[in-house]
């Protein structure tokens, strides 16, 4: 009799454990109930940056009040846009702005890593200028960057005292990839490697224009040099490898606000961890 009872108990326990685990990997979505006076929607944006105009759009949250706003910073060249995340964050009551850097995907101007950082600063300025029409709560703007966008996120946070939070997903630490390169010829050979990206026709710049600054100004590209400037920021770094461990340790050692570094079993765009990623971001936004 005891054996007969124990077995179903074990089975039920395993079922409940599996069910609970499945629950943690799920997310419940429901359609937005429109505010008739100020419904959620999407608006194209044309954002000035330098002497160029950036193409972008805003997923506007529902309701007439000003909303906290998440800025999505894409990678190199920017195939993964994380718009699944954007839709859920918007349903959570946030605006989400996506834009293409200068010289990428049709935005005007010349592409460059430093320009990307400057573009983020200019997008934040655009948010301030248009906060009433776009219903942006400029006291609560958060950056989310993927790959090169993770590098851009950490660099831009250093220049934006009013932005307190950032998520750096699978950060491309550009300096680490090229710190041992001594000549421009060697640099361009590496940059042209298809496994490292190669020549993207969607970027309005030559490989020389894009990568030569890394050789000329390595200190700027070394994210560890800016760790002290992130002391008061709330930062999450997520990776699919541990290549950024030393960088994360450097930031954590100086951070006095909030810092979390995790390595997940996934690929570069976090293909099998979309729900877990979205849930972590929502929790972070609610902090």
What are these model-predicted stretches?
Residues 75-88:
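The serine-hydrolase catalytic nucleophile loop
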